Amino acid sequence: MTIGVIGRKCGMTRIFTEEGVSIPVTVIEIEPNRVTQFKTEETDGYRAVQVTVGERRASRVTAAQAGHFAKANVAAGRGVWEFRLEEGDFQAGDLIKAELFTAGQLVDVTGQSKGKGFAGTIKRWNFRGQDNTHGNSVSHRVPGSIGQCQTPGRVFKGKKMSGHMGAERVTVQSLEVVRVDAERNLLLIKGAVPGATGGDVVVRPAVKARG
């Protein structure tokens, strides 16, 4: 089973091993994920489980969303996520909690990175700067040439240039689960995970550790 859970990033701290070694960890709160729909090959063409988490005011829920949540007999959440299933069955209303993971397990964590606004090529793509002297004037942080000549006569798609940096979907792979606190619904994951404090993250079993 390769499903994951939706959590909320609470911030970073550190814990100590019995030998006194300090381990930096990110604390992720795993509110019980409520199953809103179980998709099958017969009805949807593929197997998946759809979940929601958290709460949303009734005034912020559309009629279609309200009907979808009411059909599953679950409270409206702040979003809907879906995980593909290889095996196993779920029913609408089931809860998926932090106990899905165990200490020592490797996981992939997906979140939205912090937005940095408009950034130049040096900050955004780690370009080197131009010469500080030797005749250079007002061109110390410019990217340089962005193309060729009349042929091809255009700038190729994907060219690394200035633009909006951050605020994009990022996945960090193969992070270790240091501790699972089932009573407080917390996961302590070694290292940093994408996004700002309070942001939603998706925690899945590591794809590179499946065999």
Swiss-Prot record:
<keyword id="KW-0694">RNA-binding</keyword>
<dbReference type="InterPro" id="IPR019927">
    <property type="entry name" value="Ribosomal_uL3_bac/org-type"/>
</dbReference>
<dbReference type="GO" id="GO:0006412">
    <property type="term" value="P:translation"/>
</dbReference>
<feature type="modified residue" description="N5-methylglutamine">
    <location>
        <position position="150"/>
    </location>
</feature>
<dbReference type="InterPro" id="IPR009000">
    <property type="entry name" value="Transl_B-barrel_sf"/>
</dbReference>
<protein>
    <recommendedName>
        <fullName>Large ribosomal subunit protein uL3</fullName>
    </recommendedName>
</protein>
<dbReference type="InterPro" id="IPR019926">
    <property type="entry name" value="Ribosomal_uL3_CS"/>
</dbReference>
<keyword id="KW-0699">rRNA-binding</keyword>
<keyword id="KW-0687">Ribonucleoprotein</keyword>
<comment type="similarity">
    <text>Belongs to the universal ribosomal protein uL3 family.</text>
</comment>
<keyword id="KW-0689">Ribosomal protein</keyword>
<dbReference type="GO" id="GO:0019843">
    <property type="term" value="F:rRNA binding"/>
</dbReference>
<comment type="subunit">
    <text>Part of the 50S ribosomal subunit. Forms a cluster with proteins L14 and L19.</text>
</comment>
<dbReference type="Pfam" id="PF00297">
    <property type="entry name" value="Ribosomal_L3"/>
</dbReference>
<keyword id="KW-0488">Methylation</keyword>
<dbReference type="InterPro" id="IPR000597">
    <property type="entry name" value="Ribosomal_uL3"/>
</dbReference>
<comment type="function">
    <text>One of the primary rRNA binding proteins, it binds directly near the 3'-end of the 23S rRNA, where it nucleates assembly of the 50S subunit.</text>
</comment>
<dbReference type="GO" id="GO:0022625">
    <property type="term" value="C:cytosolic large ribosomal subunit"/>
</dbReference>
<dbReference type="GO" id="GO:0003735">
    <property type="term" value="F:structural constituent of ribosome"/>
</dbReference>
